[in-house]
Amino acid sequence: MPLSTTQSLLDSTPLNNVDARVLLGHLLEQSLGWPRSALVSKDQEKLPESLISQWLELEQGRLQGQPVAYLIGKKGFHGIELNVNPSVLIPRPETELLVDLAIEEIKCQITHSDQVLKLRVLDLGTGSGAIALALANAIRESDQDTLKIEVIGIDASSDAITLAHQNAIALDLSDVVQFIQSNWYTNIPKEWLGSFDLILSNPPYIDPRDPHLHEGDLRFEPRKALTDEHDGLQCIRLILDRCQEFLKGDGLIALEHGYNQAAQVRALLNQAGLSDVESRPDLAGHMRISIGRKAPKTPLANRS
């Protein structure tokens, strides 16, 4: 079958239908300015040879296992579209739970405040900026009049920080979200000690012996963002070791972790002296997020 039209490319590809349509739709949009609906409305129009060559390269990349998100350089996350590349993890649906939890916490604070709130949030291991930017975007769309928020994203990778900056600019969020290259807390300004209402993190938590590291998309993602090369809990220990220095009294920390790590992470939260420790399930019922709260300087019952 000659490869000359959208339909002929889709009919002849060994890729599954979903991947093929995402990749080809992206290519038509980028190369010809066609909307995704052109996969149907223009399925018989002759395509330029240059586009067909690009398609064959994308097709081959996917057949070799390269993630679709890296091939098109985009990934949707919690209502926003992010630029992604192999220097950062591909944002996943389960990480959206961290954003939802943060929104829940912020709404609770708004409910109990009779004035405009000013909140500062720290996203440790920000990668593409997914958590920081999704949270800032959600707040922008809802509670602008009752809340002023500042979000700080931290990552040890300079390439990740560059990409996160680009995403902030593309989403028009660079006025409320800033990114700092830092190995966890190392380069955070001292004047921010004790100033964060929320600390969020999706740290490297996969055990280095886990065979999944050699399967699927994980083969192509940055290993340092997946595993601590220890036991899957070392980065969580490092985060918890200093979290009380940076949290405000009554501030909350929320950590994503593996489906079988909840009990261990709760134990670490308790060891760090945090209160109200609990785990939250993902949509499949697996406990994937654990949280703890710093004790307030003044007990809530004694506040006026």
Which residues does each PLM region occupy?
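Conserved beta-strand segments of alpha/beta enzyme cores
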Residues: 81, 150, 176-178, 275-278
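Residue-level signal for inorganic ion chemistry
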Residues: 23, 27, 65, 95, ...
